[in-house]
Structure formats: C-alpha cells, structure tokens
C-alpha cells in the first residue's frame, strides 16, 4: 500500500450476512464510514437499521449506508468480503466499482474455507489482498438482526504471493 491509510476509511461490506453485518456494524458503531451491499434485506435495514444483540453489549444503528449495487457505493479504501465462498465467481464483477484509480484500495477476505485470498489475488493483485480468520460465534436472526454469542477476534495477514 503506497499511500497512508486514512484515519476514517471508507469501507464496503460485500456479504452482509452474520459476519459482514457484525463486523461492519462494529466498525460503523465506532465512527467508520461503512457501506453495506444489501439485496434481499435492503428495504428492512434501510427502514429499521441494524440490530446487534451481543455478549459484549447490544447496539442498534438506526441509519445504515445500504446499497443495492457496488456501483452505488463507489470507490473505497477497504473492501471486506464476507460472503459465502460458493458465490466467489461474482466477485470479479462486484469489486471493480469499489477500487480507486490506484492500488491503494485493500481487499480483506473474512470467508470460510481455503483459497479465497488466492482467488482474489489472481483477480485483483496480491498487493491488495489481506486474509482474515474470524474466531467468533454469531448468527443472523433475520433481516438486519444479528446475535453475537462469543469471542470476536480476527487475525489478519498479507497475501504471500
């Protein structure tokens, strides 16, 4: 990453299920500029916000930056991919509108399984890709409703390619 990371980065969440909503919600709760790609849950979250019941303290975000397409979100500093790996074939079409004109946009995968970081590196270059492992127990209760039972630690690493 050639440019310094901004103090208040613009963050896109791709895959707004339990993992994406929990970590994106925590980032938004602490003042970050977080934008969620939402499809089926869009209208519910737009109207009622994001509700997180957590062992670390419940919170509600009444206003959420939710979008139906990545083109609506536009360029970001960080893209967090938290969708199921079975949908990875959609990523080469979803991520480009989120990338800036230079190499500064980073892509962090918080997906289950192996190979997601390699796939992203092949598509967008290894210098942009970070791998993440989530040690957390969470569940999506319904549209805009997440329950966090335990832990929440994330380990990060640069792509080795």
Predicted stretch roles:
Residues 41, 113, 152:
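A generic "binding-loop/recognition-motif" signal
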Residues 39, 85-86, 159-161:
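Short, surface-exposed acidic/glycine-rich loop or hinge patches that mediate macromolecular interfaces
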Residues 2-58:
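NAD(P)+-binding Rossmann beta1-loop-alpha1 motif at the extreme N-terminus of oxidoreductases
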Residues 60-147, 155:
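Rossmann-like NAD(P)(H) cofactor-binding subdomain of soluble oxidoreductases
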Residues 150-161:
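Conserved anion/nucleotide-ligand pocket segment
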Residues 4-5, 146-149:
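Solvent-exposed alpha-helices and their adjacent loops that cap or buttress functional pockets
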Residues 14-19, 23-24, 48, 112, ...:
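Short glycine-rich loop/turn motifs that provide flexible caps or phosphate-binding loops at active sites
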């Amino acid at each position: 990453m050639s440019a310094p990371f901004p103090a208040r980065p613009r963050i896109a969440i791709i895959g707004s299920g339990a993992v994406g909503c929990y970590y994106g919600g925590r980032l938004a709760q602490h003042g970050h500029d977080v934008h969620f790609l939402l499809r089926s849950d869009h209208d519910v979250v737009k109207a009622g916000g994001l509700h997180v019941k957590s062992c670390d303290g419940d919170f509600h975000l009444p206003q959420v930056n939710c979008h139906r397409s990545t083109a609506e979100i536009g360029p970001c500093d960080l893209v967090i991919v938290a969708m199921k790996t079975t949908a990875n074939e959609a990523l080469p079409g979803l991520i480009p509108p989120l990338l800036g004109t230079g190499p500064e946009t980073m892509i962090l995968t918080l997906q289950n399984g192996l190979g997601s970081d390699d796939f992203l590196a092949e598509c967008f270059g290894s210098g942009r890709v970070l791998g993440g492992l989530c040690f957390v127990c969470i569940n999506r209760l319904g549209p805009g409703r997440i329950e966090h039972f335990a832990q929440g630690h994330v380990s990060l690493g640069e792509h080795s390619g």
